[in-house]
C-alpha cells in the first residue's frame, strides 16, 4: 500500500478548489488526510504537522492557499518530504499573488507548484511520486495516460467526420 498523502488547505473556503485532488487520490486508492491549517494563524501547528509527517506515514504533502500563500512553503521548510503547492485563486489579483507566493521559494526549500487552482494535477503529481516505489500505482497511472490517448483519438475521429460534412 502507498504512503499517505496530506492535503492541507489554508481555509475551509478552499475546499471546492481541493475537491478534484481529493477525488483523484480516492480514485487511485491513495490513503489521505485532509486538513485546514494556516501558515499565519496556526504556524506552530503547521510546523509540527510537517516535522512529524514522515514519521506519521505520509509520503507527499499537497498544500495550498490564496493571497499571501505561504502555507506550502512553511510546510516545506519543516520536512524533507516533497511538497506540492496549489496557488488558490482569490478575489485579489486572480490568484497571481498566490502563484508568486507559492512558486518563488528560496534555494533549499523547494515547492513543486502546479497551476492556479490546479488541484487535479497536484494529486496526479503526488501519485507519480508515490509510484516510484509502487508498481501497482505506476500501472494505474499508465492506464490513465492510455485512456487519455484513446479519448483524444476518439475526439479527433469525431472532428474529422464533422469536417467531411462541411
Descriptions of predicted regions:
Residues 3-41:
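Glycine-rich phosphate/diphosphate-binding loop of Rossmann-like nucleotide-binding domains
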Residues 130-166:
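Glycine-rich phosphate/pyrophosphate-binding loop and the adjoining helix
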Residues 34-55:
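N-terminal beta-loop-helix "entrance" segment that forms/cooperates
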Residues 92-139:
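Short, glycine-/small-residue-rich phosphate/pyrophosphate-handling segment
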Residues 22, 47-50, 77, 94-106:
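Active-site-proximal loop->helix
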Residues 14-18, 42-46, 65-74, 93-96, ...:
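Short glycine/serine/threonine-rich phosphate/pyrophosphate-binding segments
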Residues 49-87:
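Glycine-rich phosphate-binding loop
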Amino acid at each position: 500500500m502507498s504512503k499517505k498523502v496530506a492535503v492541507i488547505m489554508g481555509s475551509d473556503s478552499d475546499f471546492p478548489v481541493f475537491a478534484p485532488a481529493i477525488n483523484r487520490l480516492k480514485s487511485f486508492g491513495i490513503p489521505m488526510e485532509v486538513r485546514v491549517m494556516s501558515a499565519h494563524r496556526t504556524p506552530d501547528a503547521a510546523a509540527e504537522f510537517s516535522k512529524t509527517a514522515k514519521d506519521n506515514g505520509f509520503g507527499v504533502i499537497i498544500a495550498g492557499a490564496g493571497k499571501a500563500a505561504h502555507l506550502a512553503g512553511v510546510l516545506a521548510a519543516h520536512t524533507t518530504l516533497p511538497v506540492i503547492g496549489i496557488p488558490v485563486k482569490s478575489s485579489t489579483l486572480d490568484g497571481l499573488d498566490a502563484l508568486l507566493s507559492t512558486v518563488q521559494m528560496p534555494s533549499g526549500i523547494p515547492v513543486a507548484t502546479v497551476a492556479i487552482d490546479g488541484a487535479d494535477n497536484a494529486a496526479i503529481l503526488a501519485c507519480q511520486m508515490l509510484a516510484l516505489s509502487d508498481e501497482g500505482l505506476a500501472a494505474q497511472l499508465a492506464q490513465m495516460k492510455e485512456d487519455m490517448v484513446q479519448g483524444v483519438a476518439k475526439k479527433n475521429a469525431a472532428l474529422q467526420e464533422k469536417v467531411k460534412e462541411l
